[in-house]
Amino acid sequence: MGSEINDNTIEFDVLKNKEDLTKEILNEVYNSLKEKGYNPINQLVGYLISGDPTYITNYNGARALVRKLERDEILEEVLKSYLGIK
C-alpha cells in the first residue's frame, strides 16, 4: 500500500530554479534595505554597477545573500523580467 513505486520521471529545470533563487534573494535584500531605511533600488543599482558589496546592508544577512549571485546573472534576470522574456 505505502510502497508503491512511481515510474514517472521528474524533470528538474535548472533555469527555472535559478530564476526563482534570484528573485527570492533580490526580494530578501530589497526588504532588508527598506527595513533599515535605505532606498533599496538606489542601493541595488550602486551594487550592480560598482560591485561594491558595502552598498548592501549586513542586516538579515542581505550582503551575504546577494553575493551568492553573480552580478551579470542578476542583470540578466532583471532584464528578462522587464522585457517579459522567459
Swiss-Prot record:
Belongs to the UPF0297 family. This is UPF0297 protein CA_C1679. InterPro entries: IreB. The lineage of its organism: Bacteria, Bacillati, Bacillota, Clostridia, Eubacteriales. It comes from the Bacteria.
